[in-house]
């Protein structure tokens, strides 16, 4: 049986990063995303520049204003975050169907079945992070290990825009020297109880008996005992079977030039074909989505008699759909191409290994 390989991907300061992407004047500034200070709102996300002032998520906005009076305060735009998250989750699903989203900006991926001697889990994580950045302009951090607990722990060790692998050769050193407050799932209240029992590091936790931990923490004690030893048997729970594969891009400036847009549709058709190839799937519906400079979204879909998976076949349909949708007088800022109603491909497509190694 193959040794498990789990990736935990966590987007960096997700809400704030989306705001910086959509408003480049915010880059490098202390950005705080949340509700109004006057309505007892709380901080949803703070950029790393804002965190230097002590601002953190779940903090009352009124307190954030006191700590960082010159910060850039932005009202949360959940539609924008959900849209970015949908693209990110689709990237995950293009690699494996065994994806467990934990929130809009965080998920576990079981890639055990993809790993080969010439294709490591860390290499796959690098490709996933690359795809996220290319398609959304957002950075992410990844943790790679042989269980969920360690993958989650690893993803926070080289933030932002980093990656960490925890394996059998370094797990003991990492866990034994880890501050107890840095263990996933140990919050302020638990940390205080830990300190009351002289537990300050992973080594201190490791030295406690299972009986002691259960007595102090109840049912959680068993889990803490196992985690101190790097043990976690929980599985990545896939949420649903993939029904479509798609790719979209946001233009750096609003565009209404047909040649430029059609070139982008060709690129998106190729990228979608590559994803279908990795999954050995084809689909019998093609959808083109346009978002205008005024943030209005339009889409058009066509059902096909025969499923498609090749770039040229996808492009030919997408070309027609775009011509049906376009308004020469209305610039667009985003375009997407999606293939749906998936089925097992009848073509001799590349495997995921061929694609990744290209």
UniProtKB/Swiss-Prot annotation:
Enzyme class, broadest EC rank: transferase
Enzyme Commission code: 2.7.7.7
Marked site (Substrate discrimination) residue numbers: 15
GO CC, one annotated term: cytosol
Domain UmuC, residue spans: 6-187
PROSITE patterns on file: UMUC
Gene3D superfamilies (UniProt xref): 3.30.70.270, 3.40.1170.60, 5' to 3' exonuclease, C-terminal subdomain, DNA polymerase, Y-family, little finger domain
Catalytic residues, chain numbering: 106
Biological role: Poorly processive, error-prone DNA polymerase involved in untargeted mutagenesis. Copies undamaged DNA at stalled replication forks, which arise in vivo from mismatched or misaligned primer ends. These misaligned primers can be extended by PolIV. Exhibits no 3'-5' exonuclease (proofreading) activity. May be involved in translesional synthesis, in conjunction with the beta clamp from PolIII.
The protein, known as: DNA polymerase IV
Source organism (scientific name): Staphylococcus haemolyticus (strain JCSC1435)
